[in-house]
Amino acid sequence: NDLNRISAGQAQYSLLCNERGGVIDDVFVYLAADDRIIVVPNAANASIVIGTVERVLESSDVRVEDRSKSTAIIAVQGPASQQVIEAVGLPGDLDYLRFVELDTDNGHVLVARTGYTGERGYELLVDAAAAQYWWGQLRVHAEALGGRPCGLGGRDTLRTEMGYALHGHELSVSINPVEAGLS
């Protein structure tokens, strides 16, 4: 949870804890610049995370902007994920936990070399208005390489096989990082 350990263009898996050390949520934090970070919580906990961060920062000059309604996340995971990403014109040659942001003809895109499956993977943060376009393009190219869509159930199976924790399962406000094996 120490952003001083990463530099702009890097992501970090972090735990947002309450005053008692319980895990409010596990999040990815993207350091876009020294004065700009992007926090991606689990969708089910977005309002709780935003409320917690706003409460903690209320007496500071830090501005919190909730983009959960205007942003969509599409994950592309698996051995051919880099080929799929590059086939739609996005950069795929990224080291793990690195990301780039770009403006495209189809809106702003953050391409992150992250994922929650144990496979090589990417997560795209796209403008919600362009999500259908990106989904369609990614799906066509993934299917051409033998890939197919899968939902959170598939992701949950893969993350369980890898031993990755998930809030609401191995993590909760009554479980601290040490108890979860994430210290």
Please describe what each predicted stretch is.
Residues 1-183:
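Basic, glycine/lysine-rich polyanion-binding surfaces/domains
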